[in-house]
Curated annotation (Swiss-Prot):
Gene3D superfamilies: 3.30.60.80, 3.40.1360.10, 6.10.250.240, RecR Domain 1 (1.10.8.420). Keywords: DNA damage, DNA recombination, DNA repair, Metal-binding, Zinc, Zinc-finger. It comes from the Bacteria. This is Recombination protein RecR. PANTHER family: RECOMBINATION PROTEIN RECR. May play a role in DNA repair. It seems to be involved in an RecBC-independent recombinational process of DNA repair. It may act with RecF and RecO. It comes from Arthrobacter sp. (strain FB24). HAMAP family: RecR (MF_00017). InterPro entries: DNA_Rcmb_RecR, Rcmb_RecR, Rcmb_RecR_Znf, TOPRIM_dom, TOPRIM_RecR. Pfam families: RecR_C, RecR_HhH, RecR_ZnF, Toprim_4. GO terms for biological process: DNA recombination; DNA repair. Signal peptide: none annotated. GO terms for molecular function: DNA binding; zinc ion binding. The gene is recR. A zinc finger (C4-type) spans 56-71.
Length: 199
């Protein structure tokens, strides 16, 4: 264990997702040894992203404007909405070039152990989007893990009464995996083979 500022930096870096104690230590020492100008640019980039980036008022994706570039794009099919957990999942789906509709970012998944229920997600906003009658299909593209499956089942049951086609990505994605780590071919095939979410 280190003392003072070094340990504080290691502790803070260790709070980042996917960064364990050893990685936090390596990052901290890289920062200590790096060129001060490089670190200044890093700090400025972090500050800038926290100041400028917000969430799209329609879909919840990250953007620097009121609407994200996908919601602003008139070439996107507004009748199909792909529901994902996080903004990083939008990028994963976009890499496939298989989907030309629009998105809805929930901001997470149902996880009772972590205290995340449907009311903490952007489900009300999704229902509001369905009110105009233009949406014909909802594709549920949550992660194929316990939380993602719980969220998909909840959404499918809730949307069934509305009379909109609700589909779920096909198998091919590893159970327990994260959507953002799927390769383009696997994710593309999952889109092509999507199925009714209640079957």
């Amino acid at each position: 264990m280190y003392e003072g500022a070094v340990q504080e930096l290691i502790d803070e870096l260790g709070r980042l997702p996917g960064v364990g104690p050893k990685s936090a230590q390596r990052l901290a020492f890289h920062i200590l040894e790096a060129d001060p100008q490089d670190m200044k640019r890093l700090v400025e980039a972090i500050t800038t992203v926290k100041e400028r980036v917000k969430f799209c008022t329609v879909c919840g994706n990250v953007t620097e404007q009121e609407l994200c570039n996908i919601c602003r794009d008139p070439r996107r099919d507004p009748s199909i909405i792909c529901v994902v957990e996080e903004s990083k999942d939008v990028l994963a789906v976009e890499r496939t070039r298989s989907f030309r509709g629009r998105y809805h970012v929930l901001g997470g998944a149902i996880n009772p152990i972590a205290g995340v229920g449907p009311e903490q997600l952007r489900i009300r906003e999704l229902l509001t989007r369905l009110n105009d009658g233009a949406i014909q299909e909802i594709i549920i593209a949550t992660d194929p893990n316990l939380e993602g499956e719980a969220t998909a089942t909840y959404l499918a049951r809730m949307l069934k009464s509305i009379g909109i086609t609700v589909t779920r990505l096909a198998s091919g994605l590893p159970v327990g995996g994260d959507l953002e780590y799927a390769d383009e071919v696997t994710l593309g095939r999952a889109f092509e083979g999507r199925r009714n979410a209640l079957s």
